[in-house]
């Protein structure tokens, strides 16, 4: 694996101590933590309190979402008349929890409900193939989509012609216009949506429907699945999303979650993860991947809906253990494909967009490999297989959709292609700010287009390493770690804070047994020492300058405060 570069540029600190001082006084945060608050745009005491203590005032009236009245009335009618309802969800850690959430609520309302998640191999969304399966297998009067449906006009028209209403709940951006149904909610819809917060995940949109249907519109017992999807689907952890996540974590810590399946997943994770201490990082790295792993590894994703809807602890544990097994297999496969991708890309890719061609990569793991490449190179990345299918990821703060639109303008998407079999297909993509999926692209054209994308890295071929504030080693203590935790949880749109610490001496360098991690001891000019760790930097051992500037986050590990390095360069005095 290539070693991190020691020639990266660092961005200017976003906030000075003077700018942070008023927020520090108003919130009782330390100066560096207050600087993070200001750097994220919460630059008044009132806004800072919104970040630190989000309330249900951030959970907006669901009827402010265009189309909510119509869809809520149609669902109420179906429930009252005992019409058969099918909830059709996407196969990931957004669509599956959203399907479970809606099913749990409607069943509690005595509705006649079935659920169905298609296999990942069938492709994203409500295709004609899936529409025919739905009609033959379930014969519903009403289909409610979760986390999909906005672009599936043909299937919606066909079902309508067969007497089946389709209610679409979705959050994905689409250029195809409004689907042909009067029952459609999507905060990202393009026809005059005025809902105040457009970054809800698919499960979040399904929850807004539940709010509209409920006599208790703020029902924290349902927040756990919304939080799981919000973190797992890489949507912005700000505003309304932030409220749901913080409320759900408090609920879990108080052991108030009634979701038997979610608790079973936490039990199977084990180690340092428990209901009493679970945080957003645990959800993103330990819980959501287990839900995604089922579909990614070709197993039946409907088992996870059962996991999140069952009241049987023994059945929940049985399924949770299977998700654990599949996730372990997924990790092994992802690592192998990542190593193959790095060999193909080379140690120093220069194109603004990284494109990794992995002929045999299943679409289920392409996004995971892309995310690891983004972490290594800090650049938007597409992973494509031999069928022209794949996934993309982008660094936090680098929107992916404008890049995909550039590729569309170059003629790669939105065009018909004829396959070797003679079948005519349309190359297309979908997704949101940080993640996308695509299919039927011409691989050679995509590889050539990577060098022509605009808005890529700056001079030196990399994006500057973001910095929230500059601090001295002497202020990094347990209080700062606690304050940084208070400013969390962190995720998309609210990344873990990055601090610039200048002119440090490197006293020790030890490579981990895996060869991946580099453990350090560093010291400032006054002789104060601190441990540090730099992930995926084992190959840099022995090459660090004697004195360095670092960009790092702060954490508490094994009873000591430590730095987690993100970048280092020769000290600039």
Question: Model-predicted segments: where are they?
Answer:
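Cofactor-/ligand-binding subdomain signature composed of acidic, glycine-rich
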Residues: 1-81, 286-325
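A structured phosphate/pyrophosphate-recognition subdomain
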Residues: 33, 80-83, 91, 178-349, ...
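Divalent metal-coordination and catalytic microenvironments
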Residues: 37, 90-92, 144, 170, ...
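N-terminal small/polar loop signature for handling phosphorylated ligands or for N-terminal nucleophile
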Residues: 66-179, 184-185, 190, 332, ...
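Glycine-rich, acidic loop segments that terminate in or are immediately followed by a histidine
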Residues: 349-350, 355-470
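OB-fold single-stranded nucleic acid-binding module
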Residues: 444-449, 514, 539, 544-573
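Accessory interdomain/linker segments of ATP-dependent helicases and helicase-like nucleic-acid enzymes
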Residues: 469-531
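Beta-strand/loop nucleic-acid-binding surfaces
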Residues: 527-542
